């Protein structure tokens, strides 16, 4: 069982404070992450993009992944982002909730969810990632 605090090494570079240290997280507090979550389309079985006629769909993004990981340790988390109002975004929110991540501060607007394509490397071949993030809902968010 967890003690009232949990020591977690968070290697996250927040643009506003440069946090990159060993932190003590009070289990009674909530960790809030803010960032872009994207649709991840990955080739199966270590195939290259040109070899596969299928792509597996999941969701991912640095800050969302941190929220899910912390939620797995029993730490209350909330993910803040902007998503388009469509079925794919709803599936994304349902996926976060499945892992116990709070989604009550997600705002809706914009036309599209960012996408990234992953070709998982094999042996000496490195993985490849292709991003399609232009004009995503969060990239076009305005103050207010």
Task: Give each language-model segment a name.
Residues 115-119:
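Short beta-strand scaffold segments in enzyme catalytic cores
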Residues 25-102, 124, 136-143:
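Glycine-rich phosphate/adenosyl-contacting loop at the front of the ribokinase-like
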């Amino acid at each position: 069982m967890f003690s009232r605090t949990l020591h977690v090494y968070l290697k996250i570079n927040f643009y506003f404070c440069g946090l990159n240290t060993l932190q003590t997280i009070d289990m009674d507090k909530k960790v809030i992450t803010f960032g872009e979550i994207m649709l991840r389309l990955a080739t199966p079985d270590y195939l290259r993009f040109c070899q596969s006629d299928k792509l597996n769909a999941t969701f991912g993004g640095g800050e969302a992944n941190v929220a899910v990981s912390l939620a797995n340790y029993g730490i209350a988390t909330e993910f803040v982002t902007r998503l388009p109002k469509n079925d794919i975004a709803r599936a994304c929110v349902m996926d976060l909730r499945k892992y116990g991540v709070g989604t009550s501060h997600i705002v809706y607007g914009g036309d599209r969810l960012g996408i990234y394509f992953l070709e998982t490397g094999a042996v000496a071949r490195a993985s490849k990632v292709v991003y399609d993030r232009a004009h995503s809902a969060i990239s076009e968010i305005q103050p207010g």
